[in-house]
């Protein structure tokens, strides 16, 4: 049986060092735990973090606490510019995971000879925290993307054109919060280049970038997600490939498909075509009345799509629609920025 530090000749400097790092580790774990609890609502992560804190607490012996001397600590109160660069939850989580990991490593190194039980516990928790940090940051990124999705009322779906990036940038500059890259023509090298350009633009303006159909292309450019049609791969397969932190959308064209989509691991729906559209001439329009039913049924955001223009958008909003996805209304307009502003003004007025 290993003796507790109080039963051995303990160097007070080492005891003080261990006390400080036990505090650091437990505090860092608590910051991460509270985000997992209140920000992510992931009970499994909360349980693991709380268990780690309590295990360290049981090893925080009085002999360590009695060596504490905050008033004479030459490092107390020191600041670093990096501490100010924590403007989002993911940065706070990353910083506190690093803080806890570093403290645990110190406990492991200094505890080997005087407190082997503490050293072993610190090592086990440190390795567990490496994995939990990735899980937590992915979930945090996913939460941020889903919050952006919740706030997005207008999605721009692209169509091939010579001035693609100029039109998309004009729409982003004027407030569009979500872009879906759609390109059925050309080759993969061209698509990759265009998608990379759109990724940079969406990052610049803080907008979401979704890739139509192509999971591989979305992963290649680090897009925020993928939009699937009814004939595309099952959403369960796409979700396994994308992970939980990216968005997944599904096109629907009937109330039955809307019901089915509620059972799929997706984040939003496209519903339509509301009106006749040159993009899908083979599909009969579903009309605004069916959109009202789809919106009432769905537990996820519904983007109306298909032939939507500033002229017919008011009727869509009167029927209960709250979000729209457009192609021609922006991509074929004389002024993409002005067209975006006009559509957003109508959508914003409907939500006031």
Curated annotation (Swiss-Prot):
<feature type="region of interest" description="Unknown">
    <location>
        <begin position="1"/>
        <end position="128"/>
    </location>
</feature>
<keyword id="KW-0479">Metal-binding</keyword>
<keyword id="KW-0460">Magnesium</keyword>
<feature type="binding site">
    <location>
        <position position="251"/>
    </location>
    <ligand>
        <name>4-amino-2-methyl-5-(diphosphooxymethyl)pyrimidine</name>
    </ligand>
</feature>
<dbReference type="InterPro" id="IPR022998">
    <property type="entry name" value="ThiamineP_synth_TenI"/>
</dbReference>
<dbReference type="GO" id="GO:0009228">
    <property type="term" value="P:thiamine biosynthetic process"/>
</dbReference>
<feature type="binding site">
    <location>
        <position position="307"/>
    </location>
    <ligand>
        <name>2-[(2R,5Z)-2-carboxy-4-methylthiazol-5(2H)-ylidene]ethyl phosphate</name>
    </ligand>
</feature>
<comment type="similarity">
    <text>Belongs to the thiamine-phosphate synthase family.</text>
</comment>
<dbReference type="GO" id="GO:0000287">
    <property type="term" value="F:magnesium ion binding"/>
</dbReference>
<dbReference type="InterPro" id="IPR036206">
    <property type="entry name" value="ThiamineP_synth_sf"/>
</dbReference>
<feature type="binding site">
    <location>
        <position position="213"/>
    </location>
    <ligand>
        <name>Mg(2+)</name>
    </ligand>
</feature>
<comment type="pathway">
    <text>Cofactor biosynthesis; thiamine diphosphate biosynthesis; thiamine phosphate from 4-amino-2-methyl-5-diphosphomethylpyrimidine and 4-methyl-5-(2-phosphoethyl)-thiazole: step 1/1.</text>
</comment>
<dbReference type="GO" id="GO:0005737">
    <property type="term" value="C:cytoplasm"/>
</dbReference>
<dbReference type="InterPro" id="IPR013785">
    <property type="entry name" value="Aldolase_TIM"/>
</dbReference>
<dbReference type="InterPro" id="IPR041397">
    <property type="entry name" value="ThiD2"/>
</dbReference>
<dbReference type="Pfam" id="PF02581">
    <property type="entry name" value="TMP-TENI"/>
</dbReference>
<comment type="function">
    <text>Condenses 4-methyl-5-(beta-hydroxyethyl)thiazole monophosphate (THZ-P) and 2-methyl-4-amino-5-hydroxymethyl pyrimidine pyrophosphate (HMP-PP) to form thiamine monophosphate (TMP).</text>
</comment>
<dbReference type="InterPro" id="IPR016229">
    <property type="entry name" value="TMP_synthase_cyanobac_bac"/>
</dbReference>
<protein>
    <recommendedName>
        <fullName>Thiamine-phosphate synthase</fullName>
        <ecNumber>2.5.1.3</ecNumber>
    </recommendedName>
</protein>
<keyword id="KW-0808">Transferase</keyword>
<keyword id="KW-0784">Thiamine biosynthesis</keyword>
<dbReference type="Pfam" id="PF17792">
    <property type="entry name" value="ThiD2"/>
</dbReference>
<feature type="region of interest" description="Thiamine-phosphate synthase">
    <location>
        <begin position="129"/>
        <end position="352"/>
    </location>
</feature>
<feature type="binding site">
    <location>
        <position position="212"/>
    </location>
    <ligand>
        <name>4-amino-2-methyl-5-(diphosphooxymethyl)pyrimidine</name>
    </ligand>
</feature>
<feature type="region of interest" description="Disordered">
    <location>
        <begin position="63"/>
        <end position="85"/>
    </location>
</feature>
<dbReference type="GO" id="GO:0004789">
    <property type="term" value="F:thiamine-phosphate diphosphorylase activity"/>
</dbReference>
<feature type="binding site">
    <location>
        <position position="280"/>
    </location>
    <ligand>
        <name>4-amino-2-methyl-5-(diphosphooxymethyl)pyrimidine</name>
    </ligand>
</feature>
<feature type="binding site">
    <location>
        <begin position="180"/>
        <end position="184"/>
    </location>
    <ligand>
        <name>4-amino-2-methyl-5-(diphosphooxymethyl)pyrimidine</name>
    </ligand>
</feature>
<dbReference type="GO" id="GO:0009229">
    <property type="term" value="P:thiamine diphosphate biosynthetic process"/>
</dbReference>
<feature type="binding site">
    <location>
        <position position="232"/>
    </location>
    <ligand>
        <name>Mg(2+)</name>
    </ligand>
</feature>
<dbReference type="InterPro" id="IPR034291">
    <property type="entry name" value="TMP_synthase"/>
</dbReference>
């Amino acid at each position: 049986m290993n003796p507790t530090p109080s039963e051995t000749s303990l160097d007070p400097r080492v005891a003080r060092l261990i006390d400080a790092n036990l505090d650091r580790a437990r505090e860092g774990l608590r910051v991460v735990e509270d985000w997992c609890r209140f920000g992510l609502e992931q009970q499994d992560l909360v349980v693991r973090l709380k268990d780690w804190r309590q295990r360290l607490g049981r090893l925080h012996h009085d002999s360590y606490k009695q060596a504490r001397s905050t008033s004479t600590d030459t490092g107390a109160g020191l600041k670093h510019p990096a501490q100010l660069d924590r403007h989002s939850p993911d940065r706070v989580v990353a910083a506190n995971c690093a803080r806890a990991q570093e403290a645990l490593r110190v406990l492991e190194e200094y505890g080997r000879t005087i407190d082997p039980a503490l050293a072993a516990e610190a090592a086990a928790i440190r390795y567990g925290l490496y994995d939990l940090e990735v899980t937590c940051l992915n979930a945090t990124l996913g939460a941020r993307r889903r919050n952006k999705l919740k706030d997005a009322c207008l999605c721009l779906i692209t169509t091939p054109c010579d001035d693609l990036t100029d039109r998309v940038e004009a729409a982003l500059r004027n407030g569009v919060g979500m872009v879906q890259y759609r390109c059925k023509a050309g080759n993969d090298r061209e698509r990759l280049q265009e998608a990379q350009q759109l990724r940079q633009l969406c990052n610049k303006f803080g907008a979401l970038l979704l890739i139509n159909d192509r999971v591989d292309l979305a992963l290649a450019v680090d897009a925020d997600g993928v939009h699937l049609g009814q004939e595309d791969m099952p959403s369960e397969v796409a979700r396994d490939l994308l992970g939980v932190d990216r968005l997944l959308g599904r096109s629907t064209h009937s109330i039955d498909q809307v019901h089915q989509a509620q059972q799929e691991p997706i984040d939003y729906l496209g519903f339509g075509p509301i009106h006749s559209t040159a993009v899908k001439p083979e599909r009969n329009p579903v009309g605004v009345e069916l959109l009202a039913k789809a919106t009432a049924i769905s537990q996820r955001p519904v983007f109306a799509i298909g032939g939507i223009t500033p002229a017919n958008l008011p009727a869509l909003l009167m029927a209960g629609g709250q979000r729209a996805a457009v192609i021609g209304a922006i991509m074929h307009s004389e002024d993409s920025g002005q067209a975006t502003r006009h559509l957003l003004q109508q959508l914003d007025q409907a939500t006031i």
